[in-house]
């Protein structure tokens, strides 16, 4: 077998492009929560074959951005307060452990520091792309810093719903306040204070969950 040209590996497939396009529309709210998404509608809108549409939709199901039961039409999830509580419960179990491990090593990821700066900058442009994506990028940078492929896969399985949840209520994201909380997490990691790092992360996620639940109840 001849060697594979590395450039070929970086070229996105049609499924990749389609997946990204639909994902962006869902997160921006162009495809509203509760809306149905069918292979036929996607194939027609994007002028692609139905197998291509199906493959893209299957990825979105894995991402948590579509839900589909057996023989049922796929729909954009409409998350309720119990979904949010369970999501943040799961995230806290993972992320508290992550920052405690990082604190043991006094390992502050460079990428995480960049996200804190980017989040402060996003205060002037509070959009889904500028704020929510940066916010979640910070969290993921901590997870990836431990270099565990299985942990990353586990975490990524939650991130689609987390992104959707925040995108549906992104107006409540207090970027300056959240950036300050992130700075305290990184300071605790740098100091090697395992307890403080864990407590700061738990407190951050608990407050975020409470804000989201309160927002959902009010609306």
Feature roles, as predicted:
Residues 1-107, 209-219:
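Short linear motifs at protein or domain termini
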Residues 27, 61, 156-159, 190:
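Alpha-helix boundary recognition
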Residues 174:
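Short beta-strand-centered segments that line the small-molecule binding cleft or hinge
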Residues 107-169, 178-187, 196-206:
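Conserved amphipathic alpha-helical segments that form helical-bundle/coiled-coil interaction surfaces
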């Amino acid at each position: 077998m001849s060697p594979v040209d590395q450039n070929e590996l970086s070229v996105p497939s049609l499924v990749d492009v389609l997946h990204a396009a639909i994902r962006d529309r869902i997160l921006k709210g162009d495809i509203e929560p509760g809306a149905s998404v069918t292979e036929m509608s996607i194939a027609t809108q994007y002028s692609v074959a139905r197998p291509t549409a199906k493959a893209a939709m299957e990825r979105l199901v894995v991402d948590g951005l579509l839900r589909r039961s057996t023989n049922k039409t796929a729909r954009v999830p409409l998350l309720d307060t119990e979904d949010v509580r369970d999501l943040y419960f799961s995230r806290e179990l993972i992320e508290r452990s992550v920052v405690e491990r990082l604190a043991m090593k006094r390992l502050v990821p460079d990428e995480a520091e960049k996200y804190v700066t980017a989040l402060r900058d996003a205060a002037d442009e509070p959009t889904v792309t500028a704020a929510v994506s940066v916010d979640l990028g910070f969290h993921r940078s901590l997870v990836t810093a431990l270099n565990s492929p299985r942990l990353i896969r586990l975490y990524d399985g939650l991130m689609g719903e987390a992104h959707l949840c925040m995108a549906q209520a992104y107006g409540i994201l207090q970027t300056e306040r959240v950036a300050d909380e992130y700075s305290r997490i990184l300071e605790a990691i740098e100091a090697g204070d395992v307890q403080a790092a864990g407590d700061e992360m738990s407190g951050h996620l608990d407050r975020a969950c409470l804000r989201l639940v309160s927002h959902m109840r009010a609306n």
